[in-house]
């Protein structure tokens, strides 16, 4: 150790002190300049689109207002995709090495078809990154305080005032502003396929993942009602491919009592019943809903159904439903806070938006129930709180 220290202290017999200082300066400058030049070059739009996998999204960008507009200000790739702060920039550069790996080594995005198959995954990753830093790259140009709402469209001005008040992240509402939106259904439909593949009806308490017909007796051909998605049943008996189940729910006492709901006064549907299933129900209790002064009865129905499309834990269903919500309602605008509406209010709200989606009946039912079970007047019930509201 002493020899090493002495060697470091003594001037080199071969090089002068001046030469060593000069070499040190050159190395120091190189260590400063080369990374800077490297970052600058690899941040240019020309460099970004030099990979052929980026050509389709480049053409999409050229059709956007960020490429050509009345003011002549152009947002380049780095303006949107590289955070302005040094730590964020370095982190993003390191993450970008994965893009190179996926293109040239893994070959997962090296054709238009492969890229399209992963578009939703790539977009969600970028949205999450922008959400995490509160759209810092957007804010390097756009500033809530600098906006003249009088020059905006009235609806845009209204939305921007709300966003400014809450300091909302730009990406919440402005997805797809520079690139084509992905088909988000590919993500949540794959998730449903995985949920269906993991179906497990071994427990005493089960939850439906699909709309399932129910029957008055085992082996019946004609259904006596339907069990709706994300509904709980108790298993009374197992017989081959059939399950005898017990369904509990509320119905308005003065009505036809064909629809069971999760809570009295809230139209969160559990099941529809008719025929012999309806005739054999038991009334467990009654209560009056103060808001409407109507009497509701808690009923218990016994029925049969075929095995399949049932799980013994509600949480995977809610995780799938959350993907449904974010993948569907974020397409046109920022998805509102679920607790902004009450359970009954979500029916009309979702009906007003459902025409802009490609959801099928099962997906629509699952999404509605998820929203209702996390609404302002039921928040927490979707996570295991069984306390009923009177």
Curated annotation (Swiss-Prot):
This is Cytochrome c-type protein TorC. The keyword Signal does not apply. Pfam families: Cytochrom_NNT. Belongs to the TorC/TorY family. It comes from the Bacteria. It comes from Escherichia coli (strain K12). GO terms for molecular function: electron transfer activity; heme binding; iron ion binding. It is found in: Cell inner membrane. Changing residue 329 to S: Decrease in expression of the torCAD operon. GO terms for biological process: aerobic respiration; anaerobic electron transport chain; anaerobic respiration; negative regulation of signal transduction; regulation of pH. Heme 2 binds at residues 77, 80-81. Part of the anaerobic respiratory chain of trimethylamine-N-oxide reductase TorA. Acts by transferring electrons from the membranous menaquinones to TorA. This transfer probably involves an electron transfer pathway from menaquinones to the N-terminal domain of TorC, then from the N-terminus to the C-terminus, and finally to TorA. TorC apocytochrome negatively autoregulates the torCAD operon probably by inhibiting the TorS kinase activity. Residues 1-16 are cytoplasmic. The lineage of its organism: Bacteria, Pseudomonadati, Pseudomonadota, Gammaproteobacteria, Enterobacterales.
